[in-house]
Amino acid sequence: MGLYSVMRDENLLLTAAQSARSILMISCPGCACESLSYEEDLPNRLLEQGKDMDSSAVAVNMVRTRWVDRLTAMGKQVDTLSVVFPCEMFDTDREAILSALPGHDTVMILACGSAYIGIQDILKDYQGTIIPMMHTKGSFVFRLVKDETGKHSKVERATARINKK
């Protein structure tokens, strides 16, 4: 059972990022991917074998790219970092975040509430702005099926169970 999260209001996110000059966008290819696949009716994951979790996370990568393009068009410099399960990080993941941080005045987190807390704990001395992009609403049980192309999985909406808190 994963955490079910939805995107926060687009205007709220744009307002929060208004004063940012350089953004580090951290995304998670875990529960956020399934949540975005369900919420936005996007392909979930590539079915091709041999891809790592980030490369196969179609929905979260599509949403991340859309936001990077939007923020870049606003004159922001945006770098991205994918961390697999920031809710339960290894030291190497923490080090990757800390080494990517210099030069960024804003961190945007495209992940669930648990990931936000985990990343926030690492950044306790960070003086910049931290913006959660998603809001966790509960948990989910999803059945994944092949999409129309046969190349991706997608969430079967008819059998989806979302347990809202």
List each language-model region with its residue ranges.
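Iron-sulfur-associated redox domains of electron-transfer enzymes in respiratory
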Residues: 1-165
